Amino acid sequence: MIHSHSPTVIPFSISQTPLQPVFNGAAFLSPSAPVFDIRKIAGMTDLLIGTGELGKALSASLGENAVVLLRGHGNAVVGETLQQVVYRAIQTELNARLQLQAMMLDGPLIYMAPEEAAKVNARSGPDATQIGRTWELWKERSRRQ
């Protein structure tokens, strides 16, 4: 699991606009990332998951999804391997950025259909070539910096 305070994702946790996949690299978001609102479980808090009970509630909110948004706090991303969870965390941020940019354009957005996302996800398991190639690229970039 990766937890982040992704600045482009947080607005989706506090609005009525769901974070939905807008490109194939974020098909795992389909149909949309659920929002965990700690206030509904524990009332007024500091928004931190500080007890086992809150952790269980967050896990239940995640369900079978790869990403859950934490209202006013950030997001949590899961995967079967380190490479997959890092890929998903980065693609979640990128998808949020793209979705926000598209929302500024005129007209309705065309999100990935659940059927399209299912086809992408069927070939995007933890050992997928796309994830492996992207991981190797990121490793090489980090060596150069």
Regions found by a protein language model. Give the residues of each.
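Glycine-rich flexible loops
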Residues: 1-145
